[in-house]
A protein has these predicted regions:
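C-terminal structural cap/anchor segments
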Residues: 129-139
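Large, well-folded core regions of big proteins
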Residues: 38-39, 43, 47-50, 54-60, ...
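Residues that mark the junctions of alpha-helical repeat units in TPR/alpha-solenoid scaffolds
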Residues: 2, 20-23, 27, 64-67, ...
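"A position-specific structural signal for the A-helix of alpha-solenoid helical repeats
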Residues: 26-36, 70-80, 84, 113, ...
Length: 139
């Protein structure tokens, strides 16, 4: 499996904390790259380890916008995992859990992140067969 090599990469980052910038943009970028790769490969069972690393980053004393980006990333990767494994009800519940601390602050996020959040939401509702604009799609 690919995951042990990726876990070793993250361990390397974590063992060299003195080299990580504040905020740790390269570390965040590495985690997101790994999660993107796991998503594309359909290795959803490998994602929780790396999502937990994102959660640990939330404990840092960083700018509000940076922490919000981390929060959005956690949501996106959890959400895509649930949607792509057919766990639509759990994905819908997750959306509700993030309403106050993510979606109500969506204007503070980068445009690219906002678009990803809206796209994931649209895909979820299409998979739930909720009509959006009169269209229905089966997932």
């Amino acid at each position: 499996m690919l995951s042990p090599v990726l876990q070793e990469l993250i361990t390397l980052f974590e063992s060299n904390q003195h080299l990580i910038l504040n905020p740790p943009i390269y570390y965040l970028s590495a985690l997101k790259g790994i999660l993107d790769s796991l998503h594309l490969a359909g290795l959803y069972q490998e994602m929780p380890f790396f999502i937990d690393r994102l959660r640990k980053m939330q404990q840092g004393d960083y700018a509000t916008e940076f922490l919000l980006e981390i929060n959005a990333s956690i949501y996106q990767y959890e959400q895509v995992s649930y949607i792509n494994t057919g766990k639509f009800e759990i994905a819908l519940e997750l959306s509700g859990n993030y309403e106050d601390h993510l979606f109500k602050k969506i204007g503070l996020l980068r445009l690219e992140t906002q678009l990803k959040l809206y796209l994931n939401t649209a895909i979820l509702y299409l998979c739930l067969e909720e009509p959006i604009g009169g269209f229905r799609i089966r997932c």
